[in-house]
Amino acid sequence: MNAFDKNDLERANGHVMEAEERHARYSALVRRMAVTGQDTTDAENLLVRFKETLDLMRQHQQLVLRQTGSAL
């Protein structure tokens, strides 16, 4: 018996997609802040955390994928 099923894979895929969109939006915001001369130190640090979280979500997605035997 697999620990994950197709619903888990769909959920993981959705989480990754949402996190990718969030990261892209925030990255664009940080670039705009930099262009306007704002201090982006904290924003850039947060962007790194977003990327780390996204990477973890992708790892989880791959685990679910392997367990369900599905293809993305």
Residue locations for each model-derived region?
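Anionic, Ser/Thr-rich low-complexity intrinsically disordered regions
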Residues: 1-72
